Amino acid sequence: MRKRPGRKPAFTRRQVIDATLAEGIGSFTLRAVAERLGVKATALYREFSSRQELQLAAISAIAADIEPDPQLCTWQDVLRDVVDRQWQMCVRYPEAAAVIVTRPEAFGVALPRITAIVERLAALGIPGGKEGAAFALDFAGDTALETYMSVQPYMTCDEEGRTGLDKFVRIAGELPELFGMQDMGERGNLDLKIEFIIAGMEHGLF
């Protein structure tokens, strides 16, 4: 559907994006977004031609959240910072991880910011130059997203107040604890996984 011409809407694109994020970047409906703004759903078409365009605009907006601290001066710290910011983004917008992983277009709209991070990692001397930087960032980013999605069921409470981890412990009983599930915390083993990636890059395994 083409964007509709006519009177200037009583809201901004950013307000529509913020309403979308509040509704849930994966599950939002145009009607629910419009209701948050106090307008009819058809009014949104003056700014966005489709739900898909709005969703991708929201992804593009939150991609800014992963930009690392400009004061960091080693590629290792930049990579850690990007992962930390990516995790915080997922906590802030719980549906974002699944959208990013399952929508190739989402990676596309975030690519300019991702490219800038790759160039910074390369400039700071990550082994392998830009290719090594792209590999490490992709590996670490995927690890953060997948860890977030896999940990959530263990942290979420059911109607009786039991978490998925509580249920796991009850079923596992006295079996050996090989994966650190009971002590994984809200980030799982993410930090250890990222240090593993960094160590691999430092040792020239790329």
Over which residues does each language-model region extend?
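Short, amphipathic alpha-helix enriched in basic
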Residues: 2-32, 36, 60
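Hydrophobic alpha-helical connector segments
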Residues: 67-112
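Amphipathic alpha-helical packing segments from all-alpha helical-bundle domains
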Residues: 101-135, 145, 157, 161-171
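Short alpha-helical scaffolding segments that buttress acidic/His motifs in well-ordered protein cores
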Residues: 58, 83-86, 100, 136-140, ...
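Short, basic, alpha-helical segments at the C-terminal edge of helix-turn-helix-like DNA-binding modules
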Residues: 59-66
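Amphipathic alpha-helical interaction segments
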Residues: 15, 81, 112, 116, ...
